[in-house]
């Protein structure tokens, strides 16, 4: 259903470092790049994530209530994604752990304040 999500940044290099590390753990890389925009995803398609300075020239800001969820293989990968996020300028919004029956997640923000979550559905 979702093709890609684009997030705003005020520091493209800093944001690229963060998403390069996160996407490497997810097994995907940059699939599109120009001087204004970077997109990460699988070469054959599927959902992707983009990063850009806002096209209107105003500073990037965080959407209240907006969150991007990244599906992990298992609880260990949720933990790794959380650690990678914090090691690359992200901030904690909720440590890894169960969030109700059959749902395990960690919450964090990227260096620009965009909220993300890494999750899996353990058996």
What are the language-model segments listed below?
Residues 1, 61-64, 100:
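Short glycine-enriched loop/turn motifs at secondary-structure junctions
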Residues 1-16, 68, 122-123:
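N-terminal beta-strand motif that seeds the catalytic metal site of vicinal oxygen chelate
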Residues 4-6, 50, 67, 107, ...:
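Conserved beta-strand segments that form the floor/walls of ligand-binding pockets within enzyme
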Residues 7-48:
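Core segments of cupin and vicinal oxygen chelate
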Residues 11, 70, 74, 97-100:
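Structured beta->alpha junctions
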Residues 15, 19, 78, 85:
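Hydrophobic pocket/interface hotspot
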Residues 26, 82-123:
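Vicinal oxygen chelate
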Residues 41-80:
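Long, continuous compositionally biased terminal/linker segments
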């Amino acid at each position: 259903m979702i093709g890609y999500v684009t997030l705003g940044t005020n520091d493209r290099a800093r944001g690229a470092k963060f998403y390069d590390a996160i996407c490497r753990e997810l097994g995907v890389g940059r699939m599109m790049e120009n001087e204004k925009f970077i997109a990460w995803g699988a070469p054959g398609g599927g959902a992707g994530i983009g990063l850009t300075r806002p096209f209107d020239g105003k500073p990037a800001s965080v959407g209240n209530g907006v969150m991007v969820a990244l599906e992990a293989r298992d609880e260990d990968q949720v933990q790794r994604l959380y650690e990678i996020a914090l090691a690359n300028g992200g901030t904690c919004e909720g440590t890894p752990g169960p969030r109700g029956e059959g749902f395990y997640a960690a919450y964090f923000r990227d260096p620009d304040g965009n909220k993300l979550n890494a999750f899996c559905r353990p058996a």
